[in-house]
Amino acid sequence: MISAVLTTQPVHIIGAGLAGSEAAWQVARAGIRVVLHEMRPDRMTQAHKTDGLAELVCSNSFRSDDAANNAVGLLHAEMRKLGSLVMRAADANQVPAGGALAVDRDGFSAAVTKALAEHPLIEIRREEIGGLPPEDWGNVIIATGPLTSAPLAEAIRALTDESALAFFDAIAPIVHRDSIDMSVAWFQSRYDKAGPGGSGADYLNCPMTREQYDGFVDALIEGEKVDFKDWERDTPYFDGCLPIEVMAERGRETLRHGPMKPVGLTNPHNPLVKSYAIVQLRQDNKLGTLFNMVGFQTKLNYGAQQRVFRTIPGLENAEFARLGGLHRNTFLNSPKLLDPQLRLRAAPRLRFAGQMTGCEGYVESAGIGLVAGLCAAADAIGQTLAAPPPTTALGALLGHITGGHIETIDAGPRSFQPMNINFGLFPPLATAPTHGPDGKKLRGPEKSVAKKQALSARALADLDRWIGDCLKLPAAA
């Protein structure tokens, strides 16, 4: 499908976050001109701090890079096979993070910005699109993300006659490494697991006793919160990005079974005593001078954050490079509004990508941007691209967005919700593995591992066939 055909009409892409940047790259790789519109720095958002493309506003983690055993790791592998700019920039700017792929956020954004700015077929325009695109833009990708500007959001709502749902997305605090007390904290990845660029000792761990944990939970619940704006009230949270104080309010033990779970970690300062809970910090930049507090997104006000988080053992004198925050996110009822090519049924010249479609996570957003870019490139030369097989991570995610969910439950509100990639979105195996390589019958966890590995192997094989048959390109190694 992809060929170096220069068309007179460019593809217009609105929004240069992860999805828009990846879409622009894929369209340009196909030989199609791109005009990439980004409103920053002329108009900033509540969460962005720079004018860089593909700025990471929350975590710096792309999560697991294990393609054989983890669905997001599989998505990484599929995107690499398709020449993803986001994955190339992530690989080039990785920082140690155990079994995860984490990046230096500034280096990552700079790499994406440089690649797009230097591409001869990509024009970057720093301007806000204050409403629906002009009618003479016949091939448009809207990838404006969770913080779509109000005029454009209202225009989309008016066009679709749908009230976009909204949820909160959260930012975790970042701590200066040299302010952490290493006589209390220690380096270790959970179960000593090493990952890309890592050593198996990539997280900083701060232990808590039962008494310290109980006091911390009380302080979280009692801490002063930032008041919601009128337009934020009654907005549901997305469970994958709950504020830590909301988790604490759901039950006293919630945190120690979530981001503060102590399993797989041993305190070398006191190896015979098991910690009741552990706070982990993950390296945030290549220099190793900044560490972010894993899972500590919050709506506490700045004063409460500093007071409460400095009760954590090892962080008594913590200096914060950035405190946490919370912002609203919006998404479409995509199964109803979008066709399998991610086009708006009410206006097929408009295609959507990224978090607005109902995918959740950096890599998922970029992955849907990748698919949108390939589809738009096909449209530009009068072709239609077959969707990636549903057995692949990209295809499974696309299926979730464009038709994998029930519209209503008992005539109530729609049930479509944002989703991270997971093996539950994949079609079942025709024959699930029952025996291991040694011929022994698989049981319990071994059976689950074998199933995930079989799903991943099937996905990569099917993606290679799709690349060869539909894109007419050799699959990357």
Swiss-Prot record:
State what this protein does.
Catalyzes the folate-dependent formation of 5-methyl-uridine at position 54 (M-5-U54) in all tRNAs.
Principal location class = cytoplasm
Q: Which family does it belong to?
A: Belongs to the MnmG family. TrmFO subfamily.
Source organism per entry reads Rhodopseudomonas palustris (strain BisB5)
Q: Per its record, what are the GO molecular function terms?
A: flavin adenine dinucleotide binding; tRNA (uracil(54)-C5)-methyltransferase activity, 5,10-methylenetetrahydrofolate-dependent
Q: Give the UniProt subcellular location, in the record's own words.
A: Cytoplasm
Its UniProt entry gives the catalysed reaction(s) as: uridine(54) in tRNA + (6R)-5,10-methylene-5,6,7,8-tetrahydrofolate + NADH + H(+) = 5-methyluridine(54) in tRNA + (6S)-5,6,7,8-tetrahydrofolate + NAD(+); uridine(54) in tRNA + (6R)-5,10-methylene-5,6,7,8-tetrahydrofolate + NADPH + H(+) = 5-methyluridine(54) in tRNA + (6S)-5,6,7,8-tetrahydrofolate + NADP(+)
- Kindly give the InterPro entries that the UniProt entry links to this protein: FAD/NAD-bd_sf, MnmG-rel, MnmG_N, TrmFO
What is the protein's name according to its record?
Methylenetetrahydrofolate--tRNA-(uracil-5-)-methyltransferase TrmFO
Which residues does FAD bind?
Answer: 15-20
Q: List the GO cellular component terms.
A: cytosol
The protein's required cofactor(s) are namely: FAD
Task: Name the Pfam families for this protein.
Answer: GIDA
This enzyme's EC code(s)? 2.1.1.74
GO biological processes: tRNA methylation; tRNA wobble uridine modification
Superkingdom field:
Bacteria
Alphabetized, the UniProt keywords read:
Cytoplasm, FAD, Flavoprotein, Methyltransferase, NAD, NADP, Transferase, tRNA processing
